[in-house]
Amino acid sequence: TLSSRYMIYTGLTILVFLIYHLYQYTLRVGYDPAQYTAFISDGKVETFDVYKMIVAGFSNVWCSAFYILAILMLFSHLRHGVQSIFQTVGADSRKIRPFYNFVAIAYGAVICLGFISVPVSVLLGIIK
């Protein structure tokens, strides 16, 4: 399939995305702690305001575009993976192939649409 043919490229794109994602949101590189600090428990506990960080990050069109591209690559990976699961357990007959192809596409689509909705909502001004 097309997904299996481009698995190496989609996989490398997802790897670069994961590194970037960890760099940006876990290591918090580029975020001023004073600007993105939230206080919880009556001001006694200080933590990063992840909501503000996400809105600031996805307000950048290029950041959002790369995120969306990586998630579309993830769709291809998930679809291929779910199809492979059915084949691995021996459920690869012509009779049920349309069913597991549907399940693979539906699973990948639900996961990816959920992830893509965040940057799209920020870009459209739904999340501010």
Regions found by a protein language model. Give the residues of each.
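Membrane-embedded alpha-helical bundles that constitute the cytochrome b-like, heme-associated redox core
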Residues: 1-128
